[in-house]
């Protein structure tokens, strides 16, 4: 599994066997929780399959006709199969709740980005920065049609205006919608948050390395739902300031 994912993969790829390569603390928390749960699920799967096979093979009517006819319950067995799942649920719930609350916490952000979902494109507003006309920096991001793609670009994932953000910076991402419900999701950043009309949701974002990170709207929002890709470009602070200067 690790062999097939040794190269950085910030976008979906064919025959992938694991998550995309992450670039944020949120992503690391999600993958660690997944690996933690898979450890317990493996033993649960083996135990359940073993119990079913043993019951079918050894405890059928032909092998034990009297027990099959007169045994109706076993108090010890019922106690065990109630206690063990309860303990497993506790072991699963504790780290899950911890991660859930950590993902909801936004700690002293250095900048705020507002993403507005629309049919069928995204609008981004960087209200901490203004243009030469003293207006907040904002732009729309549309999917690039297949016939206009440059060589090496990803089909149905490339956009005309990428969301450029500095790395190693605490960012507050505010999400809403201008029409129907959308969902802003970038797997390699560990973020998926609904964009609901009339409501502001917020998540914390911090990018660990430079690169391009691809995502899509993950809430069915109409006939062109598949035409709402997201591209986040992580750059150094110097390059981000240069991009701001160019787009002001």
Curated annotation (Swiss-Prot):
Subcellular location: Mitochondrion inner membrane
SUPFAM superfamilies for the chain: Cupredoxins, Cytochrome c oxidase subunit II-like, transmembrane region
PANTHER family (UniProt xref): CYTOCHROME C OXIDASE SUBUNIT 2, CYTOCHROME C OXIDASE, SUBUNIT II
Species name: Schizosaccharomyces pombe (strain 972 / ATCC 24843)
Mitochondrial intermembrane side: 1-36, 101-248
Cofactor: how and how many bound: Binds a dinuclear copper A center per subunit.
The organism's taxonomic lineage, starting at the top: Eukaryota, Fungi, Dikarya, Ascomycota, Taphrinomycotina
Entries under NCBIfam families matching the protein: CoxB
Chain residues that bind Cu cation A2: 217, 219, 221, 225
Cofactor: Cu cation
CDD domains found in the cross-reference section: CcO_II_C
Primary site of residence: mitochondrion
GO biological process terms held by the UniProt record: ATP synthesis coupled electron transport; mitochondrial electron transport, cytochrome c to oxygen
Gene Ontology annotations for the cellular component aspect, listed alphabetically: mitochondrial inner membrane; mitochondrial membrane; respiratory chain complex IV
InterPro entries, A to Z: CcO_II (IPR045187), CcO_II-like_C (IPR002429), CcO_II_C (IPR034210), Copper_CuA (IPR001505), Cupredoxin (IPR008972), Cyt_c_oxidase_su2 (IPR014222), Cyt_c_oxidase_su2_TM_dom (IPR011759), Cyt_c_oxidase_su2_TM_sf (IPR036257)
Keywords: Copper, Electron transport, Magnesium, Membrane, Metal-binding, Mitochondrion, Mitochondrion inner membrane, Respiratory chain, Translocase, Transmembrane, Transmembrane helix, Transport
Similarity-based family: Belongs to the cytochrome c oxidase subunit 2 family.
Protein name in UniProt: Cytochrome c oxidase subunit 2
Described function: Component of the cytochrome c oxidase, the last enzyme in the mitochondrial electron transport chain which drives oxidative phosphorylation. The respiratory chain contains 3 multisubunit complexes succinate dehydrogenase (complex II, CII), ubiquinol-cytochrome c oxidoreductase (cytochrome b-c1 complex, complex III, CIII) and cytochrome c oxidase (complex IV, CIV), that cooperate to transfer electrons derived from NADH and succinate to molecular oxygen, creating an electrochemical gradient over the inner membrane that drives transmembrane transport and the ATP synthase.
Reaction catalysed by this enzyme: 4 Fe(II)-[cytochrome c] + O2 + 8 H(+)(in) = 4 Fe(III)-[cytochrome c] + 2 H2O + 4 H(+)(out)
Binding site for Cu cation A1: 182, 217, 221, 228
């Amino acid at each position: 599994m690790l062999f097939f994912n040794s190269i950085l993969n910030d976008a979906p790829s064919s025959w992938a066997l694991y998550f995309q390569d992450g670039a944020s603390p949120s992503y690391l928390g999600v993958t660690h929780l997944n690996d933690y749960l898979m450890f317990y699920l493996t033993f649960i799967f083996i135990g359940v399959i073993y119990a079913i096979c043993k019951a079918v093979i050894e405890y059928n009517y032909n092998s034990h006709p009297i027990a099959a006819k007169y045994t109706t319950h076993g108090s010890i067995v019922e106690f065990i199969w109630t206690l063990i799942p309860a303990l497993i649920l506790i072991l699963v719930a504790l780290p899950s709740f911890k991660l859930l609350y950590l993902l909801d916490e936004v700690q002293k952000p250095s900048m705020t980005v507002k993403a507005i979902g629309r049919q069928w494109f995204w609008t981004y507003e960087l209200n901490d920065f203004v243009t030469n006309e003293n207006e907040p920096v904002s732009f729309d991001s549309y999917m690039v049609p297949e016939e206009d793609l440059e060589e090496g670009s990803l089909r149905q994932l490339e956009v005309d205006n990428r969301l450029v953000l500095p790395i190693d910076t605490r960012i507050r991402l505010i999400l809403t919608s201008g029409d129907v419900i959308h969902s802003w999701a970038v797997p390699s950043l560990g973020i998926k948050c609904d964009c609901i009309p009339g409501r502001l949701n917020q998540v914390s974002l911090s990018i660990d390395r430079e690169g391009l990170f691809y995502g899509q709207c993950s809430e069915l929002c109409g006939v062109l739902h598949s035409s709402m890709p997201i591209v986040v470009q992580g750059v150094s602070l110097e390059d981000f300031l240069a991009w701001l200067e160019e787009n002001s």
